[in-house]
């Protein structure tokens, strides 16, 4: 009878240990998935920010170009 008790306790102990290891791995996997999703979201936000910055620089370049042309025309044709 004592042998059966020891065997049963051993089986239960090993089952609990393996179950806790599986749950820990599952939690780690979920955390990694959350981190990957956050990284993807950050990447999308960074892309939006970069696009907005490039659009602003493009607009600024157009304005500077027009001003430069206006200044050049003013100095080349001072009669106007």
Swiss-Prot record:
Pro-peptide positions on chain: 23-49
Keywords: Amphibian defense peptide, Antibiotic, Antimicrobial, Cleavage on pair of basic residues, Secreted, Signal
Keyword Secreted: yes
Tissue distribution: Expressed by the skin glands.
Signal sequence coordinates: 1-22
A single GO BP: defense response to bacterium
Region (Disordered): 27-46
Cellular component GO terms, alphabetical: extracellular region
Acidic residues biased stretches: 30-44
Domain of life: Eukaryota
UniProt subcellular location: Secreted
Family as reported in the entry's similarity comment: Belongs to the frog skin active peptide (FSAP) family. Dermaseptin subfamily.
Function: Has antibacterial activity.
Official protein name in the record: Raniseptin-8
Organism of origin: Boana raniceps (Chaco tree frog)
